[in-house]
Design a protein with these regions (language model features):
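Rossmann-like dinucleotide-binding cores of NAD(P)H-dependent redox enzymes
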Residues: 61-62, 67-71, 77-150, 214-217
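Feature captures the FAD/FMN-dependent oxidoreductase FAD-binding
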Residues: 1-32, 124, 132-141
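Core beta-strand elements of the Rossmann-like FAD/NAD(P) dinucleotide-binding domain
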Residues: 23-32, 149-158, 200
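Short glycine-/small-residue-rich Rossmann-like dinucleotide-binding loops
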Residues: 38-39, 147, 160, 164-165
């Protein structure tokens, strides 16, 4: 271990703003508390989402074999980024988007130019709802989507669910002692001091995905 560092390989949750309790019941107090619990992928609730061929951006870069056919689920920057990466490396990529445009946070004119160029590299399927993911009895899966009442099927080696991430603040029971906003993000001020009822908690700070909507993953 590191000098002056005690390591507890357990889950823990807050019992007050400066004290956490581990799974084994031990309470740990700190005058200074740094919350850096990260985030987790949010998966659509459809049949087959738990199949081993379905990955998130936590696991997609650890593939042992390169997929020849990839379905990417998602509308945002992460979905577009991985669609570009895998298509540039030679995979046939289908990006399945529930809404009528991708990159909704980006200026529409920029998105239109991006889609025009990207469409030459991979397939962007707008206004498609994910119905289910089925195993095919081999290593592939069939992704079933719906568009205007019509069912479409795509056979793929791998599915990437890039459908958003959520802060892990709920696993810490943080909302009892700190401000928690949409998708579980802990409230902070410009100095990354955690807030409670809008005011900084003395000695409390948050780092990384647990407080920021701009996810590092």
């Amino acid at each position: 271990g590191l000098p002056n560092v005690d390591y507890y390989p357990e889950y823990a949750h807050f019992v007050d703003a400066h004290t956490v309790q581990t799974e084994s019941g031990q309470k740990l107090y700190g005058r200074q508390v740094v919350i850096a619990a990260g985030s987790r992928a949010v998966l659509p609730a459809v049949p087959g989402i738990d199949l081993p061929q379905v990955h998130t951006n936590d696991t997609i870069m650890r593939l042992e074999e390169f997929p020849q056919r990839l379905v990417v689920l998602g509308v945002g920057v992460v979905a577009a980024e991985f669609s570009h990466v895998f298509s540039a490396l030679g995979a046939q990529v289908y990006q399945v988007v529930r809404s009528n445009r991708i990159l909704r946070e980006v200026d529409k004119e920029v998105v239109d130019r991006f889609v025009e160029a990207a469409s030459h590299q991979w397939n962007i399927l707008l206004e498609r709802s994910l119905v289910e993911i089925r195993e095919n009895g081999d290593v592939t899966v069939t992704v079933v989507i719906e568009h205007d009442g019509q069912v479409e099927e795509i056979v793929a080696d791998i599915v990437l669910a890039a459908t958003g991430r959520r802060s892990n603040s709920d696993t810490l029971k943080a909302s009892s002692f700190f401000d928690v906003y949409s998708r579980g993000f802990i409230g902070t001020d410009k100095y990354q001091r955690v807030l409670y009822n809008g005011s900084p908690v003395p000695g409390g700070f948050a780092l990384g995905d647990v407080f920021s909507p701009f996810q590092l993953k």
